[in-house]
Amino acid sequence: MAFNYDRERHRKDGKQGRLIGQPIVLTIIWICWALFVGWLNCWLTAGIRATIDWFHSPDSYQFLNGQVNAQVFAILSNGWQTANLGNYQVMRSNPLIFAVIELIGAGVMLPLVIKTWLKWRPNHGNQYGNDRLTTEDEVLVQYPQIPDRGFEYDGVGGIPVSHIKATAPVFLKHHPVTWLRYYFAPEVSQLATRLPMLKNALPFVEPAKGFYSIDQTTVNSLIVGITRSGKGETLVMPLVDILSRGSEKCSMVVNDPKGELYQMSYETLRKRGYNVQVLNLQNTDFSMSYNPLQQIISFAKEGYYDETQQAVNTLSSSIYVDPNAKDKFWQNSSINLLNALILAVVDYAKRNDRWDEVTMDNVLHMMTELGSKQVNVNASGDIVPSAEELMADKSLKMPSDSSIAGQKNKLLVYFAQMQKLNEKHYSQFRQMALDSFAQSKFAGDETSGNIYSSAMEGIKIYQQSNIAKLTSKNSVNFESIGFPRTMRFRLPERYKFKTAVIEIDDDSGKKLEKRTQIVDKVGMLNYAIKAKLPDDFTIKIDFDYRKNEPDYRDAKLVVTGRKLYQRNGFTAHSFKRDPYTHQPLLKEVKLTIKQNELAGDVAEMKMDYSESPVALFLVTPPNNPSYNQLPAFAVDQIFNTIYSTALANGRKSFTRVHFLLDEFGNLPPISHMDTKVSIGLGQNLLFDIIVQNLEQLQINYSQQQADTIESNCANLLYILTESKKTAETISAKIGKRTVNVQTSSGKMGDVHGISFSNQFISQDIMSMNDLMKLMGGEMVVLRSVYRQDQKGHSVAAMPIFDHGQTAMPFRYTFLRHEFNDQMTLSDIGIKSPHRSLDLKALRINYDSAYNQLLELMDGG
């Protein structure tokens, strides 16, 4: 079927009717004509020679004198007799006459041959387009080849651009060793195990069904495929498998609508050493906990004021930003109001050291409990509670001036008291909250109600108790996705902005790694560890660096580290082991100061250690798209966290991270997504974006942003679409070729009146209709920056058309063991810290918080 389809597709170029225009054919015709002329030339040469001889003979004089007899024309008769046709002895006796006639006779045919060649010559595609598709041989030479299942391979993973069957002769021609190792040898071994004597002697190894050509370069990819086009079966699932089989395993952040990919791949990924996490918004009781304010909490606790404000603004902008909105007033007011509320909660947490209460649930209730109520106030702006309110809530207090001067919104009163307190006891977080509140225009009588409604619309999902619980705890460390091993030391303040030299040695003194790192503005030394550490190791930190002042260079800190494992008993090797990898489970890494020659104590030491890449699945319910706000937050925060850590640790994440964003059009706008796809590659952060058509990019992003996202995806993998605009765009990018079109005209039955004409035209290599009718497994790959083969030779990045023996296989035909579609949530032990959480126990009492503001003012 596929062969006939290809033959029908390529029949458009008209090559079948151009045999007469081939130079070899025209040369043969001309040679045949020359031979015919030579054959006839023998007779003409003999006749002409005889005629010349006759004029010089006595017979001609006798004829001219009227003496005619039978012998007068004997010479002429012998010369012009038909027996001389093909008599090449004449050529030897009369070479000059023969040559002249031969040249004239053969030359007569040349104009006709040349005219025929000009009319019927094959088109080589230079006049109106000379684009073409990449050949199978070129794909096999240009890309790394890996087995399509089972086997580990060298290097990092990459998106598959083609697949070829193991039995294809062209693959054996280019990669005989790979073919023998992954197909022939396992096939022979599998046959041998059928023999009774060898059944248990040889390991059972499944041979590869074929081989993938993968792009291991650091590029973004855009995948286009409508629903039910097979993109999950032919690309998404195989990509997860490929990324997890490389010797340098990649971390993955996968948007997984419905959660099927998470359930199917969990067991395989765990066996391959992955730390598999899931943010399950479809069933929050079987999900990790994710507090979108956790990054803000971390910055605020450590005293990073600017970073806290930036993280707050990024989060708020992610909720309310609409690049296609014409009136930005309500959008900006909502952003500033939410900024103010979050920072006010941060200020409360800092005052009371209750950081676990910095949650979106408390932010929401600050808005609902304070922003929706009007209260009586006195002339100073203090709340004057009624007698009933005093009886109902003992925490309320009557101000000294209990006369009612009017009513105000309770949220305005709260921030007014924050302003008064800040004038007496300055807090930077409090000032940030006040600045944002002032910018929100909430204090305006005419706009406050609309701003309140607009702001509530963006965070109403946190009214759902399941979402409120999930976002009130946090059980994932985003930094570990790109940097699985990190350590931090809070050093004395005098070392701020100094360059530290960090060296890590094993217990024998062998150096594992050494690098410089700057102590940041709060005195924190954050360091990402690239090497995998032994059970016992030593960390040496000194300031003997040329850019440090001399009086700092003698400072030194030596710390010993030891891995502590979870135990089942008291024997030396009674460790708890991972049920999938069978490796001991790490409990913690204990750090002990061995030598401190710093000018002060080390206030904090901590190491987060893992040797596992992370696979984080973001399960989004298709029937409740409002929940997709959280995965969008997660993608943004993961990128920002890893990006900033990478800049401080060699500019690249130690583990390559693939953001595999299926159904990208259903996700809310990810903050600065156009910038992320532009700058992320330098930090080893790759995006694989999947849409149903190119227009989907413009649903949540402006035209300019959508164009930037598309142009920064070096690979465009097209599977199928129903969008004519998308198909036309893809067709134009594939290119055009020149074809010769023949037309005929004439009346029916008039054989001699038919005329033919030829015209060169430009034709799409693959038309819009061709692209909208691709068969299952067929795929077009547009690549823009892949311009070197495996040997470093420059190549042209021609489009690839996967079809026939290079069609992409479906997952269920060869990856059933790796992706078990029978696995369900009940088979996976998911621990959810928030499952039994009491929301009320974490909720802030804002009346008490208000009274605290008053007490702090009075106490000041």
Regions found by a protein language model. Give the residues of each.
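Conserved helicase/translocase P-loop NTPase motor core
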Residues: 450-484, 489-494, 592-657
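Switch/coupling segment of Walker-type NTPase motor domains
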Residues: 192-344
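Conserved P-loop NTPase motor module
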Residues: 450, 454, 486, 490-491, ...
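Helical/strand "switch-coupling" subdomains that flank nucleotide/phosphate-binding cores, especially
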Residues: 281-469, 480-486, 490-501, 506-513, ...
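Conserved ATP-driven motor cores of ASCE-family P-loop NTPases powering translocation/secretion/packaging/pilus
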Residues: 579, 583, 677-679, 683-780
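Loop/turn-to-beta-strand initiation segments
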Residues: 249-251, 613-615, 655-658, 683-688
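Basic- and hydrophobic-enriched, low-structure N-terminal and domain-boundary segments
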Residues: 1-229, 233-241, 246-248, 285, ...
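Conserved P-loop NTPase "ATPase switch" module shared by AAA+ and STAND
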Residues: 653-669
